[in-house]
Structures are given as C-alpha cells and as structure tokens.
Amino acid sequence: MTTLLTLQDVCVVFDDRHVIDNVSLSIESNKIITLIGPNGAGKSTLVKTILGLQKPTSGTIKKEKKLRIGYVPQKLHLNDSLPLSVHGFLKLAGKYSQQEHLSALKLVEAEHLLNSNMHKLSGGESQRVLLARALLQRPDLLVLDEPAQGVDVQGQISLYALIESIRHRFNCAVFMVSHDLHLVMAKTDEVICLQHHICCSGAPESISKHPKYIALFGQQRDQQLAFYHHEHHHNHDLSGEPSDGSCCSKNKKAHQ
C-alpha cells in the first residue's frame, strides 16, 4: 500500500490564532478517511492545506510524485443569470473530449444529465456531476468536502455506495469531510476528530465512545449518530431501510 500524502506537525496560524495546531496524518492508497469536527474546527483549512491551496506556517507535507488529486467542494456557486449545461460545466475542467465527459458521468450513473441545466439539478445530481468532474483526471486521491450536505437519505446511501465502488475501481484514497459521525460510511477505515488539533482517531464505533469525542460533541450525539452499513443485493426505501424484506443489517446506533 502506497503512502500518497503525509502531514507532519503541521500548523496554520492566522493573526496569532492556531487554526491548525500540530496535525500529523498519513493518507494511503485505497483507504477511506473521514475527517469530522464542529464548525470552526479548522476542517476547511486542513483541506486547503492538503490540496496545496494553503501553505502551512510550520511543519512538513510530503506528497507522492505526480500525485493527482480530485476535489469535490461542499457546494458549487454558479451565477444564475448565466445558462450552463452539465456538458459546458465539464468543459471548464480542461481539455477533455465529450466522450471522456460521458465516460465520467457514466461512472457516477449520471450520463443522462449531459445536456441538463446545471441550475436545475437536485442536490444529489449536483454532487454526482461534481464527482464526475473530479474523476476526469483519474485521481489517486479524492477529497470530498461534506458530500452528503443537501442530499436526502436515499441520495446519501447511493452516494456512499458510489464512493465505495470508485475507491475500488481507481484504487484511490478518499479523504472525506463531515461535521459529525452521522451516517458515516461503514467502509471508512479511519475517522479523525479535529478541533484545531487531532483529538482522537480510529474506527467510527470506537470514536463514538472516545472521551475526547464525547467532550467535544456532548450528549446530543445519541440522537444524531447512525452508522450506515450498505448491502448490495437489495433496494432501500426513503428511510434507508431495505424495502424487499431481505435479512440484512439495520442502521446501527452508537451508544455511550
């Protein structure tokens, strides 16, 4: 397994305030890491640092040579007054052919959206188009900023299953950002809890019981947490439960 990117003792300081404080982590190929933390914890700054958009104040970042990073932002801001099709939007990503656009959309099961109006896409459709754009360059590392934001439960389930299939198809690492453990992918290899520094890390179930996580998120976590375990041989209703009566795992609640 190849180490794609390593942060060692990274700090980012704005106006004498440590937004990122002594963070060390490694991202390996074919692994999924989920970064969680409350608003203002430094998640966006850490993502910018990984993408190379934010220079660390101190510490070191090592990247695999010719590392290709695909990025899916939390939300796309478009000028509503300017008409833009999905095809036109994908053209902005670089010199790729229409066939390459179609192939990328097919990977995310959205080829039917090629000529659709970007302004009229649902939250789930927008995420798939953004994901297709990121896949055009065949990334080694896929960075997803709050991918489930604004997507309904069924859409989240489908999106996570799609991310899992992409991980295997490209043998790429996935670094995913979330504000909480709610519906964290069951296939996540590691959860990192950030509050400017790394409070704790580990499997989702172990993080939910960690004293530092509990201290950070408080008792409200009991109503918020559910770990989604995807089964491939059935359909889901809108609640995310199997709709065909098959025997499979229910969503698993996290306990204290």
From Swiss-Prot:
Binding site for ATP: G37, P38, N39, G40, A41, G42, K43, S44
Role played: Part of the ABC transporter complex ZnuABC involved in zinc import. Responsible for energy coupling to the transport system.
A GO molecular-function annotation: ATP binding
Documented EC number(s): 7.2.2.20
InterPro entries recorded: AAA+_ATPase, ABC_transporter-like_ATP-bd, ABC_transporter-like_CS, Metal_Ion_Import_ABC, P-loop_NTPase
Pfam assignment, any one: ABC_tran
Assembly and oligomerization: The complex is composed of two ATP-binding proteins (ZnuC), two transmembrane proteins (ZnuB) and a solute-binding protein (ZnuA).
Matches recorded under PANTHER family: METAL TRANSPORT SYSTEM ATP-BINDING PROTEIN TM_0124-RELATED (PTHR42734), ZINC IMPORT ATP-BINDING PROTEIN ZNUC (PTHR42734:SF9)
Organism field: Aliivibrio fischeri (strain ATCC 700601 / ES114)
Topological relation to the membrane, as annotated: Peripheral membrane protein
EC class: translocase
Domain (ABC transporter): residue spans on this chain: 5-220
Subcellular location field: Cell inner membrane
Signal peptide (from-to): none
Catalytic activity entry: Zn(2+)(out) + ATP(in) + H2O(in) = Zn(2+)(in) + ADP(in) + phosphate(in) + H(+)(in)
UniProt record similarity statement: Belongs to the ABC transporter superfamily. Zinc importer (TC 3.A.1.15.5) family.
GO biological process: response to zinc ion
Protein keywords: ATP-binding, Cell inner membrane, Cell membrane, Ion transport, Membrane, Nucleotide-binding, Translocase, Transport, Zinc, Zinc transport
Top-level taxon: Bacteria
Membrane-spanning residues: none
Gene Ontology CC terms, in alphabetical order: plasma membrane
Region of interest (Disordered), residue spans: 232-256
Protein name: Zinc import ATP-binding protein ZnuC 1
